[in-house]
Amino acid sequence: LVFFSVIGLTGSSLMVRLPLVRDILNISTGTLGLILVAGSAGAMGGLLYVGKFVARVGTKRSGIVGMSIWFFGWVLVSIGLAIGSPIVFAIGNFFGGIGAGVTDVSINVDGSAIEQRLGRAAMPKMHAAFSIGTLLGAGLGTLAIQINLNLAVQIGILTTISYLIPVFISRYLPSDNGLHSEEEKAGTAGPVFTKVVVLLGLGIFGMTLAEGASNDWLAIGLVDDYNADPTSAGIGFAILVASMTIVRFFGGSLTDRLGKALTLRITGVLGVLGLVLLIARINIPLAWAGSFLWGVGVALAFPLFLSAAGEQPNPARKVATVSAFGYASFLVGPPLLGFVGQAIGVVN
């Protein structure tokens, strides 16, 4: 839970200040989209190998390695903001993405193992911890706007805190989670790209496109297309993260009652309604309501798809493969929406 909560803290504190990032780096919206994609590219690169790595060393060691790479990347992000360098910022985002990808697979394999031991859905609550961390980060980012805190200092402080806490608590984690099963050692665990894994991957691709759009562009969309002030945009992002947190916290019980598929269908319809409210561009309060429903729509996709992947044989590699589909979506989404948004407006 600690790993889940800290991995999104720093990034969400940055997302609510993306308009300022654009100004500090002196770049266009389209260029910002390309720079943001560096993180997803790094995550994709890490996911190509992380399944085998986790199976070899276990989730405890791979999680610490991932967080260490993540820390290095976000230190570079802070430096890039301090000196106004888009290149350093992008390189840091790339390494931060690699570290996040390695850590993400490690903690989701752990989460799936816990679910199987409990015999009930637990992954949504773990992803709720991630949402709590991102909500806290969004709140801290909004507070930083109010007190005019230097953005590089903000990122540096939160990066350090987010790294030291999981490193300290890692000593209490089991060291054998995620290691090769007897079937894998004997080479009888079967192929990674099964029909189920591909279908799960396609599903998570679509849903993470919607989630990535909300994380990367909601604040800028409210500023540019609603003429909202930075604080109102930050509130909109915080509402989105809050709704995701609430749904993930209670999503386990809902999933146990309705099943994964029906739960995703219901929340998905609500998410579409939220997007319609945002696209209508009526006023800021309705945009906030749309942000809330958007969060409801995307909240359970990642935990439930990865939970299903973790139920398959060879879980570390299956989770890594399905995660790769999700990060591919994050890879495609930011630049695509950035260039289209520059031409016709982010909300459009």
Role assignments for model-derived ranges:
Residues S5, G73, S85-T103, A287-A299:
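Hydrophobic core of transmembrane alpha-helices in multi-pass small-molecule transporters
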Residues V16-G30, D216-S232:
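Short amphipathic helix-loop junctions that connect adjacent transmembrane helices
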Residues V21-R22, F53-V54, L143-N148, L222-V223, ...:
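Interfacial helix-cap and linker-helix signal at transmembrane-aqueous boundaries
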Residues G46-T59, I145, V247-K260, G341-Q342:
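Helix-to-loop junctions at the C-terminal end of transmembrane segments
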Residues K60-G63, L264:
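Primarily marks hydrophobic transmembrane alpha-helices of the MFS/SLC 12-helix fold
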Residues S68-I83, L270-I282:
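C-terminal ends and interior cores of transmembrane alpha-helices
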Residues G101-Q116, A299-P313:
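Intracellular juxtamembrane helix-capping segments at the cytosolic ends
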Residues A152-R171, N348:
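Symmetry-related core transmembrane helices of the 12-TM Major Facilitator Superfamily/SLC fold
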